[in-house]
């Protein structure tokens, strides 16, 4: 199996979030639990719209964020300052998957780069450093935003329909990621 996100079933831990069971990588759950035991607040970073990502995959990421919020606020009064600090301390922001030159993702979405940005490649597979490539690199200024193609249309490298992707991104940007779980 290539690096495609496959995880052996015994490498998963089931946790209930908003009344539904989700399977999370045991290493991630254990890391969060060990951080609390050590008095450290770890920070997970999230990326959405990777090639192959579906809405169900994104829901699992969102559920893990919500599980962390519940974990860090367990036993605290929602009105308390400590609850608010712990809840806000869980990173609920997400980057949008971005194909940077030289990365594995760049190679995976090469045909999309040609279609969306008119990027050309030489016979060795390297991008031709012309105006199209330069404009693409300028578009990479902020990985939290949605890339727009040469026509100004949004680009989604994942498997979600564009309308779904844009709605999810809207929920992330508005700080209402829990709404993704309801989609």
Language model region names:
Residues 1-183:
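A structural motif corresponding to the C-terminal lobe/cap of the Radical SAM core domain
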């Amino acid at each position: 199996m290539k690096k495609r996100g496959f995880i052996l079933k015994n490498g998963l831990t089931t946790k209930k979030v908003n009344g539904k069971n989700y399977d999370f990588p045991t290493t991630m759950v254990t890391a969060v639990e060990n951080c609390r035991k050590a008095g450290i607040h770890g920070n997970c970073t999230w990326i959405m719209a990777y090639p192959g990502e579906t809405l169900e995959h994104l829901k699992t990421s969102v559920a893990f964020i919500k599980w962390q919020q519940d974990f860090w606020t367990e036993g605290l009064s929602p009105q308390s300052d400590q609850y608010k600090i712990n809840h806000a301390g869980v990173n609920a922001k997400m980057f949008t998957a971005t194909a940077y030159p030289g990365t594995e993702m760049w190679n995976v979405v090469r045909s999309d780069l040609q279609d969306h940005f008119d990027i050309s490649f030489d016979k060795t597979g390297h991008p031709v450093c012309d105006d199209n490539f330069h404009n693409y690199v300028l578009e990479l200024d902020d990985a939290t935003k949605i890339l727009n193609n040469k026509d100004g249309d949004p680009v989604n490298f994942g498997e979600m329909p564009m309308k779904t992707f844009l709605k999810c991104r809207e929920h992330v940007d508005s700080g209402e990621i829990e709404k993704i779980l309801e989609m």
